[in-house]
Amino acid sequence: MDYDFKVKLSSERERVEDLFEYEGCKVGRGTYGHVYKAKRKDGKDDKDYALKQIEGTGISMSACREIALLRELKHPNVISLQKVFLSHADRKVWLLFDYAEHDLWHIIKFHRASKANKKPVQLPRGMVKSLLYQILDGIHYLHANWVLHRDLKPANILVMGEGPERGRVKIADMGFARLFNSPLKPLADLDPVVVTFWYRAPELLLGARHYTKAIDIWAIGCIFAELLTSEPIFHCRQEDIKTSNPYHHDQLDRIFNVMGFPADKDWEDIKKMPEHSTLMKDFRRNTYTNCSLIKYMEKHKVKPDSKAFHLLQKLLTMDPIKRITSEQAMQDPYFLEDPLPTSDVFAGCQIPYPKREFLTEEEPDDKGDKKNQQQQQGNNHTNGTGHPGNQDSSHTQGPPLKKVRVVPPTTTSGGLIMTSDYQRSNPHAAYPNPGPSTSQPQSSMGYSATSQQPPQYSHQTHRY
């Protein structure tokens, strides 16, 4: 390359340190790199941004794939990549996103902590409905554009704080997303293990090779149940964190303890699953005779005749062929009864959730989880965010993660497929404060976060 051209190119290249002020504003840290809350130096706007510095030098193929997807996706409920900076001097890669102040993992933890402190603060019904509708809207857009997310969980669902997009849901972390219109080989061959265990569909646990967008719908059902109860519905101890074998006995056992063992008539193709013989060897149908989703949700005061429960049943249908689609779910009667979903999930009320705190350069954002991770090496397999959660001694660990990855905050940019018309209901009552004993950890909008929740739910190492 011509020397003069290289000099000219270098002089014209925008440098992140010249454009943004971010020193001392770290909000996330992990094996993926670092995330900073940043502002423009030129004062052209007063917005907050999230700057993610990718760990290491250069750019990996997985990062290239994620960036390529993010540059194409434009929808109000999907994260939007603003810009990519390449530092020529140290070969660092920086990604710029809009800053999201909250995420579902911290929101749910806030309510779970209030319950643990005997000062229960329920997630308002209207907020749950608005959150679910916007998640479905974003996933419908992805699926309509032939994209599987493959790692949906509360930590990857961001919620914008004060500002023009107040209360807007952003689906984050496209690190495991894949196009599924014409794969060269079965997706299971490309990535044998996807989706954090607690949110993993039964067909994945049974080794399905040609899995579909139904895996995202199951994960949304898990998130919906967690919003309704403040407890992860399929939490269990995790083992074999490094295994590439999708079959997981304990996770299947947890699902059957909640849902019951699937009858042949309910899932006819279960016999075609690669791990069906292992399933029949390890499990006895009569062990789960008294288990059902109705009984589980009744314990959490969700009535089986409610529209919320009926939709949950459709999302958590064992047979992926019979599982509802995102488009069908958005048309469910649940969204037609009061309170109606709103574009601001907080419905104009005061936001009760704490803002993210800054980390020191030496302070890992997952300091509260580091010890847990060492103890859980076989217990947590999470794609970068491990949710331990638990109501009893069997769930003292968090959901396993796969590779630690970061979840960028996001912005809105208009939808290619459909932008919902959210109907606004009457404002919900303001949330009571559960008190100082429920202090929240640093949230890292899907980037990464410190988990300081009660020991039984020292949930997760967040990421971006």
UniProtKB/Swiss-Prot annotation:
Active site: which residues? 151 (proton acceptor)
Query: In the UniProt record, which is one GO cellular component term?
Result: cyclin-dependent protein kinase holoenzyme complex
The first-level EC class reads transferase
Identify the domain of life: Eukaryota
Which pairs of positions does the record mark as disulfide bonds? Answer: none
Task: Look up the EC number in the record and give it.
Answer: 2.7.11.22, 2.7.11.23
Reactions listed under catalytic activity: L-seryl-[protein] + ATP = O-phospho-L-seryl-[protein] + ADP + H(+); L-threonyl-[protein] + ATP = O-phospho-L-threonyl-[protein] + ADP + H(+); [DNA-directed RNA polymerase] + ATP = phospho-[DNA-directed RNA polymerase] + ADP + H(+)
Q: Where is the composition biased (Polar residues)?
A: 409-426, 436-464
Q: Report the locations given in the UniProt record.
A: Nucleus
What segment(s) does the record annotate as region Disordered?
A: 361-464
Sorted alphabetically, which InterPro entries does this protein's record hold? CDK, Kinase-like_dom_sf, Prot_kinase_dom, Protein_kinase_ATP_BS, Ser/Thr_kinase_AS
Mutation: residue 189 to N; reported impact is:
In a lung neuroendocrine carcinoma sample; somatic mutation
One Gene Ontology biological process? positive regulation of transcription by RNA polymerase II
Question: Composition bias, kind Low complexity: at what positions?
Answer: 373-391
Please give the cofactor(s) recorded in the UniProt entry for this protein.
Mg(2+)
The UniProt entry's sequence similarity note says: Belongs to the protein kinase superfamily. CMGC Ser/Thr protein kinase family. CDC2/CDKX subfamily.
This protein is called Cyclin-dependent kinase 8
Source species: Homo sapiens
